Amino acid sequence: MAADTTTLTTDCLFARTRVQVCDALRSVVPGLPEEVVQRVDLTPTRDPSHGDMATNAAMLAAKPARRKPAEIAAELVDKLFALPEVAKAEAAGPGFVNLTLKPEVLQGVAVSILKAGDQYGRSTMGQGTRVNVEYVSANPTGPMHVGHCRGAVVGDALANLLEAAGNTVTREYYINDAGTQVVALTWATYWRYLQVIGTEISADDFSPLTPNGLQYQGEYLIPVAQSIADKHGRALANADGGPADPSVWFETVRREALTQMMAAIREDLEALGISHEVFASEAETLASGRVDAAIAKLDSKGLLYEGVLEPPKGKMPEDWEARPQTLFRSTEFGDDQDRALRKSDGTNTYFANDIGYHAQKAENADVLIDVLGADHGGYVSRMRAAISALTDGKTGFEVVMCQIVRVVKNGEPVRMSKRAGTFVTLRDLLDEVGRDAVRFTMLTRKADAQMEFDLDAVVAQTRDNPVFYVQYAHARCRSVLRSAETMFGADTVTPEALCSADLSNLSSDVELAVLRRLAAFPRSVEAAATAREPHRIATYCIDLASDFHALWNRGREDTTLRFLHENDRATSLAKLALVSAIAGTLRCALTILGVVPVEEMR
């Protein structure tokens, strides 16, 4: 369904024109249900010869009005052509109506942008809607790696995007600090602790002492172990330096390891420009009784029963047995099978624990969005069923899937990090190319599409590198404005001063094309927020940068298109208003992506 663009900022040309289209439709089709009118969309045309924008209004109204779309479109054309802002209206295809606006209407977009400043593109679409976005939630068992990086950037940009669309957003990180992986981390840290205090014990010798083998052998645990040794000396080992009974050391090492690993993760996130408002602990959630409360609530609704699940599809696990378990009737809420909440031994399943955590989030949110790796596909329907059951359908649950990232340099996969032992760390990536390049590149493709992160391409100063291309456009804009300050005085080129420029000088096809692009930004924000696709904003940045560079290049051949005319102040100010509007829109878009626009290229 089309977004209700009446909620867009009042400076949005698409919002104002859509209101006029809806009024015309009501006039042409009296008594049309309002829910049909609210679905009317107004989209930028891809081909300028088809006008500036197109609407589906006639096609939406055809069925309820029991009339042909072309007939309604013809009447809409007459109504819309009579509007003072419209230069041309024509029916097209099966019932579209294309609109061409008068140049002064497009020229006014620059003024709207200058007046809106950093608020350009923001709307009230999501006003009153509380959205919880959970992202990263990396296990605190090692450094953040490139896989975490994509989810972190996508989640953070999505949160920014939803805020720009008017939602109240909570950014949350779930600390998986209870379970077998934390146990494995604790044992691995203790092994490094023994080595730090001088005990000669290899991984092969220590591994048999652990519950499930020595799973984490990266060098990143050595500083953690050293910190523990500095604080506790040899007190956590036997007199001869050998392994002590876990009752002596386990809880101390677990606590220290978790604290330091989370501190390292927070530092990595800060370096990536990410800040969460909430860090929720799995251990605290389990201790709070929320899991049992959620299970009890489902039981009170008659949604639990004792039963035996069908055997897993595909290869049968050797240890699988048909055992009675407490099952949740998730199929009643769209899942493909009922799900186990309690095992035959009375312990909760991981899914049950996760339900308790999501129920906790749902207490303060209208929509829950989890940003997860692509291997969590089977998770969506079961959790959506649980949230729907617990909240009587009042809280929505969505998942944004992030595909894997392959890092290459010189055409070859990047060597694994020695520090991490098994993967390319986030710090490796940031040290190599910088925060803004990492963030923008991670957002150049849809989250569920696989990505190759080419370290050479990301730092190349060519038009084929979208990071450079977009930043260069902003830097060029700022360079023009600085030159204008020297030529005409700083007071002359402020946004306030440029608002009074005679914009009729912006009349060339290439200038009007840029203005069309600028006019579409608020709509792009809402469309991206509705689709939960922040990569659309990166695409918008690339398209706007392309339009600007095309205008710059045309100015080399056609002097009338140049931005500065020392002997023609009026024309210069009009061009500068456009340049300032481009820079401002790029800044607003990059802010959503969490990227800092550069003032000059170095």
UniProtKB/Swiss-Prot annotation:
Catalytic activity: tRNA(Arg) + L-arginine + ATP = L-arginyl-tRNA(Arg) + AMP + diphosphate
Gene Ontology biological process terms from the UniProt entry: arginyl-tRNA aminoacylation
The UniProt record lists the keyword Ligase: yes
Gene3D superfamilies according to UniProt: Arginyl tRNA synthetase N-terminal domain, HUPs, Isoleucyl-tRNA Synthetase, Domain 1
The UniProt record lists the keyword Lipoprotein: no
Pfam family, one: tRNA-synt_1d
Keyword field: Aminoacyl-tRNA synthetase, ATP-binding, Cytoplasm, Ligase, Nucleotide-binding, Protein biosynthesis
InterPro entries in alphabetical order: aa-tRNA-synth_I_CS, Arg-tRNA-ligase, Arg-tRNA-synth_N, Arg-tRNA-synth_N_sf, ArgRS_core, DALR_anticod-bd, Rossmann-like_a/b/a_fold, tRNAsynth_Ia_anticodon-bd
Record's subcellular location: Cytoplasm
GO cellular component: cytoplasm
GO MF term list: arginine-tRNA ligase activity; ATP binding
EC number(s) per entry: 6.1.1.19
Motif position, 'HIGH' region: 138-148
Superkingdom of origin: Bacteria
HAMAP family, alphabetized: Arg_tRNA_synth (MF_00123)
Family: Belongs to the class-I aminoacyl-tRNA synthetase family.
UniProt-listed PANTHER family: ARGININE--TRNA LIGASE, CYTOPLASMIC, ARGINYL-TRNA SYNTHETASE
Subunit structure: Monomer.
UniProt-recorded name of the protein: Arginine--tRNA ligase
Taxonomic path: Bacteria, Pseudomonadati, Pseudomonadota, Alphaproteobacteria, Acetobacterales
